[in-house]
Amino acid sequence: MICIPIVGPIQKKSLEDIAAAEPLADFLELRLDLMSDYDLEALLAASTKPCIVTNRTKREGGQFSGSEEDRIEILKQAIAAGAEYVDIETSTPKQLLKPFLESERKSKVILSYHNFTDTPEEIGHLYELMCAMPADILKIVT
């Protein structure tokens, strides 16, 4: 499967990139943390492919600079707008992560971990912890 990231940084460029990626991709990843201007509903409507909405934190390689609550609110808006998938980090505070892991949800949840420095020795333990959470997909990047 091929997933092509859409990074903006503005709406017009994102829409152009969606149109260019559509014939090549199985999925599109809308990297909201890299966009300064976007209309999420319009981006989702522009794609015929399933979309993964990501709002990555700086600590895991992204650019979102607002509060953790604001970041999570944007992902909740993505669910309300009809995103097929949302990608949320395991490092998200548990009280903010919990609503994404409840059984009744409109979008599938990708629970992710990113470490671009090294592969931690406790990667097996991390994987076990992630498996215990009711996410649809687990993603570990190291």
Residue ranges of predicted features:
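Short beta->alpha connector loops
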Residues: G8-K12, D33-S36, T90-K94
